[in-house]
Each structure stands twice: as structure tokens, then as C-alpha cells.
Amino acid sequence: DADDKIMTVARELRQSEAEKLLLDMKGHPSPARARGLAMTAVRETFEEAGIIIGGTAADAPAEIAPPSENPSLESPAAKTWRQFRAYGFAPNLAPLTFLARAITPPGRPRRFDTRFFCVEASAITKSTDHNDGELSDLVWMTLTESRELDLPPITRVILEDLAERISKRTLDDPSVPIPYYFNRHGTFRREMLHLAARSA
């Protein structure tokens, strides 16, 4: 969203994560697009779960005022950022770890090219009661507990990727490649995206 690009942040995305986001990026890869993906992750985490991943930014306004002439013209993203900033925080991109990428198989009504991020619990600045209504019955659970749920196959796969990174203590290791899931000729595939492949 265009409004993600103009938000002042407390801390920028780590260079290693920004570079990984550029791997096999379709269209015209750019640092701005990579940053935008991270901004979207922080915004949607607040939007759907009320969780703020933020910090303080000296040059960020205390609040973002809605459009004075016609509030109805305010984009959904701009409205969410205004609500985010009302808690006194600017988005913090530094804790984000780019975990995996997956593309919805062909033939589905809606297809997504999704990037999955994770943060350590200590990066959560505040949990609020903000909720856009898209999700319900939000609860915290362990990875072991999540395995008992009726989850989409790709969600299970991503959670196992997360479990592996946690067990190996590599969440902050910039050299770890990114799992990339997609379908080709009807076959589910997993490729690993390496930073070296981009610099070669």
C-alpha cells in the first residue's frame, strides 16, 4: 500500500532481511518494495490481532490526523496507521525475520504471493483490543499445541519451518536461506532462496 511507504519508523528493516525479500521478487525489485512488505506485516499484525511491534521515533508525529476535507477518502491502510500511532508508537521493522514465502497454487479463486515473518515475543511493544473483525477467538499457543489444530497444509509447513529455526537458534542468522513454496506442473515444490544467488 502506498501509505506504508511514507510512514516514519522507529527502526528500519535489517539489511539481510531486506536483501532476502528481493530474492526472486517479481516485477521490478527495489528496496522500497522490500520495506513495504515488512511494513505491511507490522500493519496487518496490528490490524487483525491488535499487536503493536513498535518503538519511538523522534521525527514521527505524535498522532496522524485524518483527512480534514473528506475523511471518507482516507485509505484503509492510512486509517490503520493513524490508529497505530495513537498508541504513541512508530512501527519497528528491525525485529522482523523473513521466515518463508509461498504462492497459492493455480486454480484457486484468489491467489497470493505471501511472505511470512516472525518476531520474538520481546519485540511486542503492546497488545491492544484493536481488531478489524477478520479474525476471532485469538489465543496464544505453543507450536506443539498448534499441531493439534485443523490447519491448512501450508500453514503447517510454515510452522514447522519456524520450529526448526527456533530449535537451531537461527532466527537471527542472516545466512539462513528462505524456503520458497510453489506449485509447478501440478507438483508442490520447495526451493531454498540464498543471498549468494542474488550476488552471484
Regions found by a protein language model. Give the residues of each.
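Short glycine/proline-centered loop/turn elements that form peptide/ligand docking sites
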Residues: 40, 57-60
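Nudix hydrolase/Nudix homology domain
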Residues: 17-29, 62-200
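Short, His- and charge-rich active-site/binding loops that engage polyanionic ligands
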Residues: 1-23, 35
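Short alpha-helical functional segments enriched in proximate histidine and acidic residues
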Residues: 48-52
